[in-house]
From Swiss-Prot:
Glycosylation sites: 232, 986
Ranges per topology, Cytoplasmic: 1396-1484
Disulfide bonds: none
Protein name in UniProt: Vacuolar protein sorting/targeting protein 10
Subcellular location field: Golgi apparatus, trans-Golgi network membrane; Prevacuolar compartment membrane
BNR repeats: 99-110, 383-392, 451-461, 497-508, 749-758, 842-852, 1116-1126, 1157-1167
Family: Belongs to the VPS10-related sortilin family.
Cellular component, GO annotation: cytosol; Golgi apparatus; membrane
N-terminal signal peptide: 1-20
Stretches in topological domain Lumenal: 21-1374
Role summary: Functions as a sorting receptor in the Golgi compartment required for the intracellular sorting and delivery of soluble vacuolar proteins, like carboxypeptidase Y (CPY) and proteinase A. Executes multiple rounds of sorting by cycling between the late Golgi and a prevacuolar endosome-like compartment.
Pfam families named among the record's database cross-references: Sortilin-Vps10 (PF15902), Sortilin_C (PF15901)
Transmembrane parts of this sequence: 1375-1395
Amino acid sequence: MKWLYNPIVLLAYLFVLSGAAYTPEVRLSTHDVLPSAMQYFDDSPTILSLKNDRLWISQDDGKLFEEVGATKDQHVVSFQIDPFLKDRAFVMTNTKTHFYTENQGKSWKKFDAPIYELKENGMASVPSIEFNAADSNLLIISNYQCPDSGKYSHRCEHKYHYTTDGFRSVSKELPIKAHVCRFARSNPKSQIAKVSSIYCAVNELNSYKHIVQSTLIRSDNFGKDQNVVDLNESGSGAIIDIKVEESFLTVVQKLDKFSENSKIDMYVSRDGESFFKADLQVDIKYGVMSFLDSSPSSFFVQTTDYSSKMSDVAKLFRSDSSGVHYKLLLDNIAEGIVMKVENIDGAWLANTAVDKESDSDDLNSFLDFLLGGGFAKDIVTKFSFDDGDTWQLLKLNNEKCKLADGCSVHLWSFSEYSGKGKFVTGPTPGILMGIGSEGKHLGKYEEMNTYVSRDGGASWDLAIDTPCVFSFGDQGNIIMAVPYHGVKQESPANYFYFSLDQGLSWEKVELEKGIFVLDILTTLDGTSRKFLIEGVKPEEGKQGYTRAKEVQYFVDFANVHDGKVCSDSDFEEWTARKIDEDSSPTCVYGHREKFRRRKADAKCSVDRLFEDIKVIDDPCECTEADFECSIGFMPSEKGDGQKCVPDPTAIKALCGSSKSSVLEIYDKTLVQEDKCNMGGRKVDDFATMEKFKCSEYNKPGDDNSGEVSKIVVKLNEIEGRLSQYAYVGTDDDKLADNVVLKTSEDRAYISNDGGISFVKVPVHDRILGFFTGPVSGQVVLLTDSEYMYVSQDGGALFERRKIPAELSSQISRPIAFHKTDADKFIWIGSDCSKGNCEPVAYYTTNGGQSFKELMTGAITCDYVGSVFEQPEENLVYCTKVEDNNLRSLWSINGQKNPEKLFDNIVGYAVTGHYVVVAVVQDKSLEAKVTVDGKTFADADFPNDLKVEAHQAYTVLDSTSGSIFMHVTTSSKRDFEYGTLLKSNSNGTYFVTSLPNVNRNDVGFVDFDKIEGLEGLIIANIVANYKEDKAPKKLQTQVSRNDGSEWGYFIPPPTDSKGVKYKCNGSPLSKCALHLHGFTERADYRDTYSSGSATGFLIGVGNVGEYLTDYNEAATFLSIDGGVTWKEVQEGVYHWEFGDQGTILALVSANDDTDSIIYSLDEGKTWSEYKFSDKKVKVLDLATVPTDTSRKFLIFAVDPKDSRETLSFSIDFTNIYARQCQLDLDHPDLDDYEYWSPIHPEGQDKCLFGHEAKYLRRLSNKNDCFIGSAPLSEAYKQIRVCPCTRRDYECDYNYVRDPLDNTCKLVPGMSAGDRKKSMCEKPDAFQYFDSTGYRKIPLSTCVGGKQFDKWEPKACPGKQKEFNEYYGRDVKGGKLFILLFVPIVVFVFATWFVYDRGIKRNGGFQRLGQIRLDEEDFSDGFHPIEDNKIDVVVNRIVKGGVVVAAGVVATLKTVRKIDSLLLNKIEMLCLGETRERNYVNIPER
């Protein structure tokens, strides 16, 4: 339910809770409950009010209210007054029974509509009625119910019922499963279709609740007949809304039906049959597009950017009379405040946002944030008299504030709350009121006053020196104004003002009780002399204001001017749209407007109750401004926009609906409903007739068919050289396409549209750099001052925060973010107050508004608790420098005292669910690992790898359930390399995965875990490690089973020109594909792969024995996970993936260029697009981190002048005509296929014990985009595979022998050494006899080859602990259970069998007579069997006899076997020796 009052005024009241002239008749009434809705009937004194689920009515303008008797026993949730039938209103309840009146509430009738009841399970919406302006009997009532989450989406189910007799009879359910339905005649000016026609959007969902198809349906008989309406070039998006505004029917469609934040397309029609796609060139996201008061000849659309939590900005667009072509009228509209002036065509008021002139440190009050003073930018108010084409500042009629001096009036609000339930400027002939201040921009709340204008908003006078809520009566000749507060801001107002001379003078009236005013109501047309002041009166308790009561003041000006009614001489003719007395009125829509209004000083009342203001039209002479482009043409992008050029898409559509083969169209036409006077001129004086042959516009693939490339490029020139950039999100549900960048000029820039445009961050301090956090939207700018600037909305708004300690050169990372809470972060700086500049760590829990000291001496800190499987949200680890200059690790958990964990550490790393600490002990480097933040275990390295204190190690990855770590074994300058280690699942035992892995001098390693594919790793090794001298000779190695086995990439047979490589035919060790790795990348974010483009890899390298120089490389592509490759371009290129791999983009990295190379068909073909009119030096090619966008950014510099950064936005959004069809219920009928990764040496598709299938776009469906289609939901494992060698890796202290692929003990170690090393650990009580193999944690294989069988054994002297751990110790109660209970059961069972099966069948003597060589007891033994129990017992007896005979026979036979034969069998089965240090498994 929307709150009907001015929200700012209400919040002002809430803020306080936290803290002998003519006199009209005033009447006070109080109530316990505030209304949630209040509204007038049109041309009536009757008001409906909803309070606490009860309906109230007043027949006398609010003087008295009484509860509606018909609904007393009902739970009323809302009401709607018919906008077209003045006497009718509908009241909705939470049941299926509702009410309506046809006489303004004098009587009420029931009607039933079996839509969703609000009492049912799930979230049901408040019912809503769709009215028909052409036939009041045709109505639709509907609501919707959403799944348990309650969040509105396409998954919500709508239910529609209709009536053809105004609900006098039972309504009928609409037989259309629609998402939205609208009457074609839901606007009085609409002549679309038939009176009974409805348009509905129907979404077809599959079992996954995905939209498979979205269709526009028209029905002229409420669904009995349904006709599909074709939206021209609509692709396959999802219709989200249908609007009928003025004479336009618009259909709003998401381009990406799987994204709630998709770009929006709008289709417009005036006849309901032919739809044209609007050219609204802006990324519009659902929920941020609104339709403003439109004229008969144009649409006004506002798009609002909600990326900032505190500073929403909007754009205002105006369409031509076709509703297709749009012009941007105003940008950067602050808080979306733009409003058309009532009754005056072409007059608008708007607030614009401009950068602040300074970083003022003055504190804003709470009311400042509510009233605009807390806005992130300065607010400047402007007006337009020419329908938005030009905008000007508001003049103050005071010599102290002149426009020439940059002084003008700026209004925070210029609207009143109408009795219709919406905010308007007021139904007056040019008389306006506003709340604001004067100066260069809107001031603080304490500077705000109330102003009045008598010329439609061009000039203003100071009316009251305090902000007021206002309302107009008697056509603007009575103005009511109630201050927001009393003398003090925290006190209620106990008086109000009124003016009887259009705001020139004011009288003050005292009130019986002070109130915080909410709004002032009067009749819809503003002709009444009665007002209702609605407010609240706080009640004081022991702790201040505790609750509030509703206070109403009924104010009646019935006897004003002694009852005198104005005569003709009391009126004047006023002309609208005149900026001043000397200027001519502006012509809009071909006419000037005049009004007869009362003279300001006349002492009389107009007293024309319910009579709307009349406009006197004065036609203007026709000019070019009265003409616009005809359908089939569009405004030229060159010049002033007056020239019209052919629109191929529109011409194609016109040809499709025309029977003629030739179209003859004027390039311009008179604006619809334009009233200009042609005089002696003709249309040909303004327009030119053009002819088009339809045959030329219907050729498939022809440029004129609308299939031309729709790549859009936007250049931004940014001062300074690019030094840092990053993509950031705005919230968790939105695409992270905000871009923040810093330049060498120490300035920061922000883009909130994916790089299409950039704005400088209005910070005057030098910006040293920025950090982005793990929570979407976190950005912190560091400066050279005592302030930092914090944003939580992707840089849309930065708030200044004072740093608790200054930046220090010894602190490499001054900020540490919390993983999940954006308000928590740690600041580390130097406290120089005592002269020693000691490092100190502080923490904040409120986004930097305040800080508390965390630890003195800390140089690094991290929130680590959230990474563990059982999170400790406030757990922090800090590295502290001790007095001896050694480093120690400390743990701090919330308010607890710091606890030292380790002395003499090198550092720590947080990866996955692990924290790894490097500790120096006994001159060697040891690793400690924790998975819970409390208990640390030793990380045991292979026995042949001794890590000295000076050796470095790098923690690389842990996404596959194991830690990958690189330990440096050669730190010689320019010849650094080391051993790649991999841990078991808890990070305690490490084995050698790959030796001699390349690293650089700062510790970065040539190691890449490929996103999107399990266990695929690429690393570069130093092949000439034995030479121990530079230069390195690198080779690329790939593992497809998570580091267990390594091999070479198979090279492509030919290069990009079709020429065979020289080494073709040589073994892979001499001829393989080698790629430049992590250590050589200019930007470490440029990875081989993308998590969304499954199986796609791009890299720069060469084919040969070794990796050659970077500048001599070529660019290679694989689309099958690296199994096969092809060279796509000769030379070094930057690369990016777009739209989950449907767009592959390359741009030259070494050579100056003006073109981008792209492929839309998985690299089969490549196209070149020129993005610049001159060649530039490209710095980087970028897109969103998820690679799901269809926008790219090229950062470049002019080769001749690198002092500024050139940013090119390359937008492929419109290059695809449709979105790929995804239907997981019918996968054979959509645009996708399943793809499985394979091993080059495997005969099946089993990897890690299962066959996985990933969904990818069909290779031949290159005409569609993927967007946000949830392809991950389609991932499946179709079968579990038997275990093979590839499912195992070497166990601890074992290493793979590449010659025979077996795991052998590390050199110099025996099985006994392994036992010794494991048992020597503190508190160790067991060791394991290993086969040398362990199962890879990622593998899910079952059965097959089992290579990892091992058995735990007790360490010497630890048998007791071993038994206790495995529950093998026998004592006490366990001994009783193990011995006594089985004995009792056995004795009882034996007695029972003897009694029922042996004793009564003759005893043991009888059994002894049975021959054991017969298959049955046919010798006459017939046991007694009276029931089933006897049968079971006798079978046990028989079976016992047979088993006994078998045992005896076996023992006799064993005696005959020669003992030598047993020895031979044992040797054959077990081998000649039982001592082994490897297991030979030839099977791969």
